[in-house]
Every structure is written in C-alpha cells, then in structure tokens.
C-alpha cells in the first residue's frame, strides 16, 4: 500500500510542478533574460545533470553529435532548468532503456538547436500523458525567443530546442 501511496504522491507533485511551470510560462510580463553567453556555457551544465540522472536510471547515451561551437545565445536560467528537468523526467517515464538517448547539436546561421531523441518503451503510455509538460516547454522557449519542435511516431520521440543567436 505504501508504494501505491508514494507513486500517487509523486504523480500529484509532478502535476503541481507542471501547473506552476504553466503559470510561469503564461506570464505576460517581459521575461528577463541572462546576459548573452556561449551555448556550451548556457546549456552544458543542464545537459551534464541530465546525463547523470539518465545514467543513474540505467539509460545509455549517444552524444557523438553533440558538438560545441562558438555560438552565443540568450536564455533565462530558471526556465532552462525547468525545461531540462521536464525532458529528463519524461525520458525516465517513457523511454526505452534498451536504446540509447541521443543528444546532438545543430547549428544554422541564425539559430542553434539541441536535439534529444529516445525510443519509446510503451506506446500506450503516451496516451496517459496530459501533454502539459511539452506545452510548458514550448511556451518557455518562446519567451526566450526560441522554439521547441516535437515529433514522435510509434517508436521514437524527438524534441529540438532552438535558440536564437544573440
């Protein structure tokens, strides 16, 4: 019984966190962004923390295509932490541990992206999600003058976080 109660508490906490993120992301006031900095400086620690948590949860990582270039972006550290926390939690819930989580970087002239791809463990689990976390990520990225592109099929989930050049 204690396991059931604990799982329900974790579920309620997750939903509460998502509602809080949503209220932050929907705030109409101009978001204060951090000073422009190199993409690795802005994102590297969040990716390292995500990698640590995923490895602790028995996931393997493929980071061969994660390359850092001299590319300045402007972010809000609070939002970025929430975004990567959400992505990490979703991977832990829905990803297949038998396939590596792939993290790569993409550079274009006016923007750069971090793409995270994983195989889906159980297709039916995607129907039990509210989708609020992805909506929150999309709203937060928009407030940072970026965007989140999400795609998935029956076997794979992909999210790309696009950051505008500062």
Specify the residue positions occupied by each region the protein language model found.
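Short alpha-helical segment of the dimerization/phosphotransfer core of two-component systems
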Residues: 7-12
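Conserved micro-motifs of the catalytic ATP-binding
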Residues: 27-32, 70-75
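Short conserved segments within the C-terminal catalytic ATPase subdomain
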Residues: 53-64
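Short helix-loop "hinge" at the ATP-lid/N-box region of the Bergerat-fold HATPase_c
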Residues: 90-92
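Short beta-strand/loop element within the Bergerat-fold HATPase_c
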Residues: 98-110
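Glycine-rich/acidic phosphate-handling loop/turn and adjacent ATP-lid/helix
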Residues: 114-132
